[in-house]
Amino acid sequence: MHGITFDIAHMLAGSLVLVSFMQLYQDRLYALLNIYALHALVLAASVAWQAFIQDAPHRYLTAVIALVFKAIIIPTALHRIIVRLGIHREIETVVGVGPAMLLGMGLVALSMVVMLRVTADADPLAREDLAFALSVVLLGLLMMVTRRNAVSQVVGFMSLENGLVLAATGAKGMPLVVEISVAFSVLIAFIVIGIFLFRIRERFDTVDVSALDQFRGERGDRM
């Protein structure tokens, strides 16, 4: 597994990290959802390529799931939620874009150092893909931490899960049932979070999670 196949696998995994940075940089909800759709599209391409080079036809089903659910259905549904909630605005962040990007670069560097050392005896392609996957996971987690808007936190969570799928497909012999269970777990979580967003909107007239903190503080003062 060398030459062009090796290079394409790395290019796709690296592209997923790059798109994760694009999500971290974005400060508008519509654009963020479009970039997440691109994130899922790159994931689907990466999984399909892994299916080809590993000669694992069942991986193609995982790629189709990523393409249909993650790149089309979920972004479309979130677009509709945004329209119904009337939250066409910029995303409020805990820290600025600059510090967030610097933190992201630090997390990617940490991922590379840790994974390449821990997996020193593993297959070269697998260990580098795992390093990229951990980078995607940590960038998704960073996005959840640095965003106040609940919708953007949902996108961060789904991006994190994309990193887990990348790690699972990069490891040979990973059962398909694991990948399917992860995908449907995210779908269920998406439904629950969608209901939760409507409840927040009805109660607080906003989806900014800082409203919840303020409400808890007011209740604490009364008690």
List the model feature ranges, each with a label.
Residues 1-223:
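Alpha-helical transmembrane segments of multi-pass membrane proteins predominantly involved
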